[in-house]
Amino acid sequence: MSEQNNTEMAFQIQRIYTKDISFEAPNAPQVFQQDWQPEVKLDLDTASSQLAEDVYEVVLRVTVTASLGEETAFLCEVQQGGIFSIAGIDGTQLAHCLGAYCPNILFPYARECITSLVSRGTFPQLNLAPVNFDALFMNYLQQQAEGEGAEQRQDA
């Protein structure tokens, strides 16, 4: 048996933590006088880095902006971090784990933090729907493949 066949896949959460939090209500208290019919915008971003052999940090950045017309009611940003031990996988499987599986684990923590911050700002409760990070990751891979295809066509 080769050494590669002996390597078992292993996944463990070492730590989940809040890396950064920001909440702004730039138009308070005037915004509280208006009818609450906001336009809510959700932005997501993930980043990962290798900390040691088989140890990775994944950071999920969630930004929620609620606007009433042209005015920002609130802007809330949370960077939810996690340290994960991941062994026995590489390539596309590792990229999927770091880009979809780990963010799926982190999102409920970020969502709870955002809900709490919005509530502390005395705004109506904000319920963020679950996010399909697997679909987002597949879209990312497709965009990468299309980008490489375009580069190859330009080189030809």
Swiss-Prot record:
The keyword Chaperone applies. GO terms for biological process: protein folding; protein tetramerization; protein transport. Keywords: Chaperone, Cytoplasm, Protein transport, Translocation, Transport. Disulfide bonds: none annotated. It is found in: Cytoplasm. InterPro entries: SecB, SecB-like_sf. This is Protein-export protein SecB. The lineage of its organism: Bacteria, Pseudomonadati, Pseudomonadota, Gammaproteobacteria, Enterobacterales. The gene is secB.
